[in-house]
Amino acid sequence: MQPQYQMGYDRAITVFSPDGRLYQVEYAREAVKRGTTAVGIKAHDGVVLIVDKRVSSKLLESSSIEKIFKIDEHIGVASSGLVGDARALVDRARIECQINRVSYDERIEVEALAKKLCDHMQTLTQYGGIRPYGTALLIAGVSDGESRLFETDPSGTLLEYKATGIGIGRPAAMKVFEEEYTADLALKDAILLGLKALHSATEGKFDVDTVEMGIVESSTAQFKKMTKEEVASYVGQFKQ
């Protein structure tokens, strides 16, 4: 049963409760909190995204689970929450990148893309007949030689981080980052720190088949998803 004071205020996205809350947005955030853990770490020479794919059955092909997406040559995202909603946002992000190239003949800035996505997500908290996206994104990229890492949430809030996590394991991952992150990390060390955070978030329940990684190096400004062999190499180093 819902509390009496809450009934009626969570029926429509456009209605605030007396204490200033939008319950549908809060419920969308809960969908993110139930999602798999994704972490992002900014190093002095790039950015890394690492995701726990949570293979729920031995019959499931782990390669069919995709939580990290290449958006443009220099930008990638990791998602947590409803996978279908994440795909819709990824498609929109790719279109925004193409529009920018056609209009200005140049790559879109990482921050500009993040703001466009958050503006779109925010509009879905204002109108009836629709619902907020039940997903959050970590947006990693390089602009003008500088590494950037942004986090979105269903309300359209945009925050930039040095290191962060989303999903069910966020508290454990953030504890690791707050204790061990330093701004002078090299990309390889950032990957190992990200694996440590993911290890803590999943209570050690990960291996090469359940981990997905993507990196963008400042020197090349090229985002790439790591191969299974590259992931296995870093997981092996971490477990030594």
Swiss-Prot record:
* Compartments (UniProt record): Cytoplasm
Summary of activators and inhibitors of this protein: The formation of the proteasomal ATPase PAN-20S proteasome complex, via the docking of the C-termini of PAN into the intersubunit pockets in the alpha-rings, triggers opening of the gate for substrate entry. Interconversion between the open-gate and close-gate conformations leads to a dynamic regulation of the 20S proteasome proteolysis activity.
GO biological process, any: proteasomal protein catabolic process
Coiled coil ranges (UniProt) are none
InterPro entries for this protein: Ntn_hydrolases_N, Proteasome_alpha, Proteasome_alpha-type, Proteasome_asu_arc, Proteasome_asu_N, Proteasome_sua/b
Q: Does the keyword Cytoplasm apply?
A: yes
Instruction: Write the protein's name.
Output: Proteasome subunit alpha
